[in-house]
Amino acid sequence: MTQTTVWPIDGGEVKGRTWSLASKVTNPGFALGVGFCKYFVFYDPDWDYSTYGFSSWEKDSHLVDTFLAADNPDLAQFKASDGKLILWHGWSDGPLTPLASVDYFKEVELRDPDVRDYFRLYLLPGVTHYRGGAGPDTVDWLSTMVCWVEHGEPPDRLIARKTNKNGQVTMTRPLYPYPLRAVYKGTGETSKAKNFDLRKK
């Protein structure tokens, strides 16, 4: 046992199965990982993961890290320029754990206790990798950002929606900026936002 977290959270196992389990179709997690290494890290379409020794991974991935990494918690310049940031993540995201976004927010907050003045994190229940899944995955992020940037109205309670293929809304759920969360009242349909209350974590 190495005490290393391999699969960090419960939830979304069914909807995320194609990212983590073999199937008759090409596993997207495998294709994404191997393709990323071939074309972004090593610039070698013949790169073979089965012969790679991971002891040099930090050195090998340094170049791609310089233009893809988004993990610097020092947002002082961003704040000074009056920047505003909304980060959202699906709780059922298979390839990228939402706990990474939570950890990032906490790191920023350690540097700046006033982080919520310019940075809000929303976690969408049942939503997989950027959209889809059992949960409501549609939020009007653009209007939310416009209200914050142009009218000085920071986002608070938002409504996420799930629609069917005909565009009909089949589920709504309130969202609150982390660490606040919506909790089912215990009565009424779980597909209705009105049946959820705000709870502090």
Language-model segments: which ranges?
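C-terminal His-loop and adjacent cap/lid subdomain of alpha/beta-hydrolase
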Residues: 1-201
